[in-house]
């Protein structure tokens, strides 16, 4: 079987949002290979930097963990400077022959900033503080934007509702959520 005829990995929805001084990253637990669900309880959201930074990753698992390790190293080199650490990681990701082949995206956030990191060298800060990445990311993003201004809904409630909407639309997203907050 040639590499191009192998089924591709799918199965991540990551959502990051801010409301009322809180930041939340939520991720579903599904990993699929082609049309087959391989795992339903993967943990794609983590706290790093001594618990002061949230990370959610989408893409090939080994690639995502490689990038997570690299981000942690950059954070050790630039403590308390999430944006700088992300820019340094993006530079490496873009220029290093090994890293530029990695297929993953990351949503990262601390108490002050939320960022998307891509393999194209992008470090993006959304103007509304809401990020959606992965196969169901756009569904979760749209749902979160619709819910964000509703009084009485806190950041975690919005994240859970938006992720449930994404899980109801995207076949590569399940309702088994991990939610971390600061």
From Swiss-Prot:
Binding residues for Na(+), per the UniProt record?
167, 170, 173
Q: Specify one Pfam family.
A: Proteasome
Q: Which GO terms describe its molecular function?
A: metal ion binding; threonine-type endopeptidase activity
- Alphabetic keyword roster: Allosteric enzyme, Cytoplasm, Hydrolase, Metal-binding, Protease, Sodium, Threonine protease
Q: How is its activity regulated?
A: Allosterically activated by HslU binding.
Cellular component per GO, a single term: proteasome core complex
> Which reaction(s) are listed as its catalytic activity?
ATP-dependent cleavage of peptide bonds with broad specificity
Provide the active-site residues from the annotation: 12
**Could you tell me which InterPro entries the record lists for this protein?**
ATP-dep_Prtase_HsIV_su (IPR022281), Ntn_hydrolases_N (IPR029055), Proteasome_sua/b (IPR001353), Proteasome_suB-type (IPR023333)
Residue ranges annotated as coiled coil are none
Q: Does the keyword Hydrolase apply?
A: yes
Record-listed E.C. numbers: 3.4.25.2
Picking any one GO biological process from the record gives: proteolysis involved in protein catabolic process
Primary localization: cytoplasm
> What compartments host this protein?
Cytoplasm
| Described function | Protease subunit of a proteasome-like degradation complex believed to be a general protein degrading machinery.
Assembly notes? A double ring-shaped homohexamer of HslV is capped on each side by a ring-shaped HslU homohexamer. The assembly of the HslU/HslV complex is dependent on binding of ATP.
Family the entry assigns: Belongs to the peptidase T1B family. HslV subfamily.
Against PANTHER family, the record matches this protein to: ATP-DEPENDENT PROTEASE SUBUNIT HSLV (PTHR32194:SF7), METALLOPROTEASE TLDD (PTHR32194)
Query: What name goes with this protein?
Result: ATP-dependent protease subunit HslV
Organism in which the protein naturally occurs: Paramagnetospirillum magneticum (strain ATCC 700264 / AMB-1) (Magnetospirillum magneticum)
The organism's lineage is: Bacteria, Pseudomonadati, Pseudomonadota, Alphaproteobacteria, Rhodospirillales
């Amino acid at each position: 079987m040639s590499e191009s005829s192998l089924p591709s990995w799918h199965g991540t929805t990551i959502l990051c949002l801010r409301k009322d001084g809180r930041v939340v990253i939520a991720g579903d637990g599904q990993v699929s290979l082609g049309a087959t669900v391989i795992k339903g309880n993967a943990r794609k959201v983590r706290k790093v930097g001594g618990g002061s930074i949230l990370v959610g990753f989408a893409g090939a698992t080994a690639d995502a963990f490689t990038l997570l390790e690299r981000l942690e190293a950059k954070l050790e080199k630039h403590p308390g400077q999430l944006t700088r650490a992300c820019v340094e990681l993006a530079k490496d990701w873009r220029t290093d022959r090994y890293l530029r082949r990695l297929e993953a995206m990351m949503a990262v956030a601390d108490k002050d900033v939320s960022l998307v990191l891509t393999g194209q060298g992008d470090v993006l800060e959304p103007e509304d503080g809401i990020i959606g990445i992965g196969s169901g990311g756009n569904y979760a993003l749209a749902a979160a934007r619709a819910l964000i201004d509703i009084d009485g809904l806190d950041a975690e409630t919005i994240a859970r509702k938006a992720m449930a909407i994404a899980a109801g639309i995207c076949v590569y997203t399940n309702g088994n959520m991990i939610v971390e907050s600061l």
